[in-house]
Amino acid sequence: MDLYVSSYAPSLSALIRARERARTQKNAPGYANVISFAAVGQAQPGGGQELRELPEVEREIHRIRDETNMPPDMTFEIVTGDAATIEGAIQAFREHRWVHLACHGAQDADKPFESWFAMRDGPLTLMRIIQERYTRSEFAFLSACHTAVGDASTPDEVLHLAAGMQFAGFNGVIGTLWRVDDAIAHEVVTRFYREMFKRPVIDFEYAAEALNVAVVESAKEVPLEKRIVFVHIGI
């Protein structure tokens, strides 16, 4: 980690599309370096989902707002509780360039488009996400379990949640390889955004490097196997 920065791509074509999309976005009239950012968190999923409460979700999101030196001109919307529904999340995806998602998530290896994030009124499936068009989206941080896990038997054929978000229109995505420890997630997430926001020009294309910095900075407090749960995909 001290010698190189890791980033992955579901396929070469996905990487090419993301680069072309990012170039088009940045060259579009009216594009400005003022980031519109939404944090979507669901601590108490409903809709018949039998999932444990996630009491640390609100704390994670408020640490992003309060402890990362967020630029004062950044638009930051918090979508939690009753507002963090399927349609509430989709609206945040449509309206903001960056999205942070803190909730339960699960991969369905047999039916990858049925993989989901748990919202207040039920599961937000990958199929539902890709039905929309996201012209503004640039970057998504998926602070949920198993969002970048494929299938060991067919690693090149399974569309996991992080790859699906890139396919839907997010040029860069951070996902997780296994269950996320809440306390560790808080530290890595806070350090990641602090690193992103300290640059004179805030750009989502710095995400892979910022994640590497956050993971390395956590080395003294966090064991390696828990630090490397987060991976960057795309650009």
Where are these regions (language model features)?
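Catalytic cores of enzymes
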Residues: 1-235
